[in-house]
């Protein structure tokens, strides 16, 4: 009896979720609303650019054997999964992480904590750091970065919320 009740409750819950999804789709003029994903952390990209790209050739070869390939994958995979608009914010975030780490090393301050993700308050990024990131990330990760990223200061770019399409389908195949 308890098993039947639990199965009935589970079926009701699933039916309610499908009904809500259908309502969302039909009100959205044939398109499902997408749920925002948390933004990826860009620390790996900053670490990769500092440790694998900006080092002399001999050190770079040593890193290549140890961890650069993995760091590159961990940087590029989330970058490829976000919208072009969000990539502009990601470029700014990577540039800011590098800037803060360089400032910390210059002034004897501790480096930025690893848990930081992009979308936090922004400082003006030096042009040379931004240029290096803009020249490296798109070709390294085979992604497009919007043209306005090259001319718009990071402090004016608002964090972009991006979505990954829902896996559920709506009634009538509209979504």
Swiss-Prot record:
Residues 1-19 form the signal peptide. Pfam families: Gliadin. GO terms for molecular function: nutrient reservoir activity. Contains 7 disulfide bonds. Keywords: Disulfide bond, Seed storage protein, Signal, Storage protein. Transmembrane segments: none annotated. The keyword Lipid biosynthesis does not apply. SUPFAM superfamilies: Bifunctional inhibitor/lipid-transfer protein/seed storage 2S albumin. Seed storage protein. Not integrated in the gluten polymer through disulfide bonds, unless incorporated by reduction and reoxidation during dough making. Increases dough strength and bread volume, but decreases dough stability when added into a base wheat flour. Belongs to the prolamin family. This is Avenin-like a3.
